[in-house]
Amino acid sequence: GYRKPPFNGSIF
């Protein structure tokens, strides 16, 4: 994941 929720879980 990256950044903070709700962006967690995505890998960029």
From Swiss-Prot:
Superkingdom as given in the UniProt entry: Eukaryota
Query: What are the annotated GO cellular component locations?
Result: extracellular region
Bilayer-crossing regions: none
Places the protein is found: Secreted
Positions carrying Phenylalanine amide are: 12
**This protein's UniProt keywords:** Amidation, Neuropeptide, Secreted
What's an example Gene Ontology biological process for this entry? Answer: neuropeptide signaling pathway
| Family assignment from sequence similarity | Belongs to the FARP (FMRFamide related peptide) family.
Protein name per its UniProtKB record: FMRFamide-like neuropeptide FLP7
Supply the source organism for this entry: Penaeus monodon (Giant tiger prawn)
Q: Lineage, please?
A: Eukaryota, Metazoa, Ecdysozoa, Arthropoda, Crustacea
